[in-house]
Amino acid sequence: MTEKTNLFPNLIRFRETNRLKMAIAASIMLWCATPQQAAADTYEKHEIASVQQQKVKTTGTVLDQNGEAMIGVSVKVKDNATMGAITDLEGKFSIDTPKGATLEISYIGYKTVTVKAEGTALNITMQEDAEVLDEVVIVGYGSQKKVNVTGAVSMVDSKVIESRPVSNVSQALQGVVPGLNLTVPTTGGALDAGMNISIRGAGTIGDGSSSSPLILIDGMEGDMNSINPNDIENISVLKDAAASSIYGSRAPFGVILITTKSGKAGRTSVNYSTNVRFKSPMSMPEMMDSWSFANYWNEAGINQNGNIKFTQDVMDKILAFQQGTLTGPDAAGISWQDGEWKKYAGAWANTDWFKEQYHSIVSNEHNISVNGGTDKVTYMVSAGYMGDKGLTRHGDDRLTRYNLSGKINATLSKYVKLMYNTKFIREDYDRPSYLTSNFYHNIARRWPTNPVKDANGYYLDHSEIIQMEEGGRDVTQKDQFYQQIQLVVEPLKDWLIHAEGNMKIVNNQNQWEVLPVYYHDGEGSPVAMAWFDGYTPGMSRVNQSYWKDNNYSLNLYTDYFKQIGDHYFKVMGGFNAELYKRTNLSGQRDELITPDVPTLNTGTTEQKANGGYSHWANAGFFGRINYNYKERYLLEINGRYDGSSRFIGDKRWGFFPSFSAGWNVSREPFWRDLEHIVNNFKIRGSWGELGNCNTTAFYPFYQTMPTGVENSGWLINGKKPNTASAPGIVSAEMTWETVRSWNIGFDFGLLNNRLTGSFDYFVRNTLDMIGPAPQLPATLGATVPKVNNADMKAWVLKWKFLGETVLKILIME
């Protein structure tokens, strides 16, 4: 008895069993029936409109490289999706087309074939597309064929990003990558607000710790919301410890790898694109009208103490206002009495504050790129402009972004290649200084009985409209400058040495203003009002700040490939170092000579200045071993020895390993009779351990002494003295949070990857999270320091089908 007969006695007769063959084919035809019928209906209409055009009937047969009939192959007229057909059970098709039309024959995993329709019988042989079958996935410090990946990795190409009318990359990734969670931050809909990003949920609740993934742009940490989405070639998301462990303590909760476009050899190509976006507020709360609002208030008052908030006279005016029967001064919805506007329970307008504060806008984007080169040198230069506006109606809220990038790849000799990459990004964000999170919060707290304007047509002081339009600006300019250079040397065949140097400089400058604001009394005269609680009416202030971030990183690594028969080996090892520096300076002054020139020099009070300097550094040695046998049995081992300046002594260094394995079941000989139905089936599993050094405090082991300049409550020799307080207590035992996780799952593809999906079961343990220590007696005289004293565990079960997550269960403790 043969191996096939032992394992699958019924499947060996698959090709000979007509009934089963017809059932499978019928299922495929049912899957394709709707678009086919739609195309046929449309074609009939097209035929009526073109009776005078000469038609020919073209028939043919489509076979694969082995001479097997291909079922469900798409046959359509080029540039006319309404005229098409699909091949039947025997690979045959028939289509009526204009004479001389070009036919496109296509199928997933095969190269598209184009032929002329001349009314003759065609015999088409489809060739497998090696680029599709050998799809490459970007991983840490290299790439792998997708079929050989054993970690949890998802990839997004440029077509997905370009098809979405969004202004930044995080918006483009929403709903695209399973397990990638993007949520709106507390800053709400601010134009410069990126998304809060996590992979497979929150990974830590440790004090000062972050569970955000590491984001690398062409191998260097960067802000993905600032780069031009049009410049992106692909994005890889490394989800589990096996995939991300090569990056060590900077990536305990995954990695997002962004690769930008490169030039292609050939004639110079110029591409231009423009986008016009129409944006409108969505999912706004439906607020009560003033009549319902007043009735609820009165009912609450009666239930509480027997008193009503709105008098019967005001209730009558509320109803009349909504009916549009009020005339004269009452039509304004408010009255001036006893030296003030009678707002809230004394007003009778009917205002929907969400509709008043929001409106629809139009934004635009322009992109141009030039690329080309020879077989020795290729280049890519691109530029982009994006002008975006906020949805707030009052106060101009706008963000402008300029992108300029260039990339050169050069083959210097048979053994040496050079890559140089540069980017410049400028973002100008100009908005009302009052446009803070409190603004969004307060909209829902506004009473609908208050009108927008008083009886004289001036804005009332109960809403933020006056502050938004007249209270000053918050202007930020952010410049990012990336410089990257890479040298690749191949001293021997299949042995590569990589040297990468990266530098990123970010310059930020901001001016934040408080300008005098005024409402108007019953006679239309201006009256100074407080800009915000705690501010003196009529006061003014200007704050100017500047900060500069310098990031430097060095990557030195080497890899070696070796194939012995059906055994494939790849070994990689290297060194990584990072240095981050920040310098900041700010100044503030009040009581401007004139609000028309809001600068520090035009302030009249004592000038306040502040500044600082901080930095951190990381270093790590890493290695990886890959092995596969006939791309059937897969093994990967990673290790990284990491050091961080954020810890001290023997706590500074840590070793973090990971292991993963996979089995490509669909590459087994016994699977051949199933491969035209289930063409891909891979089982995989991984385990890994990573440290987390992403703490808020750069040096939590240092004692600090709070200081103050002339802030004492008494005088010495006629002056307020400088002060210094006792230092806090620190924990010398503070060390890494440790993230330990394992993942099992499988990937599958049906009908030559027409239908794809995956299943994952994932467990993550976060150990030694930083939290408060047990309280000590107050006689200690200081705050108890933070220590490593908390753990968290998460289970995730996820099922993905056709690129969509159809089931996700998350349990945390």
Stretch-by-stretch model annotation:
Residues 1-404, 417-419, 482:
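Short, small/polar-rich motifs associated with maturation and membrane association
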Residues 94-95, 110, 118, 206, ...:
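Short, intrinsically disordered/low-complexity patches at protein termini
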Residues 97-103, 115-124, 218-232, 428-468, ...:
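Generic structural signal for short, solvent-exposed loop/turn connectors between secondary structure elements
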Residues 161, 211-212, 407-426, 460-514, ...:
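Extracellular/periplasmic, surface-exposed regions of secreted and cell-surface proteins
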Residues 163-165, 183, 196-198, 205, ...:
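Localized chelating/binding microdomains
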Residues 232, 383-385, 517-534, 775-776:
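A short glycine/small-residue-enriched secondary-structure motif
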Residues 285, 290-334, 418, 423-459, ...:
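A surface-exposed, glycine/aromatic-enriched loop/edge motif typical of exported proteins
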Residues 368-372, 452, 562:
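Short acidic-hydrophobic surface loop/beta-edge motif
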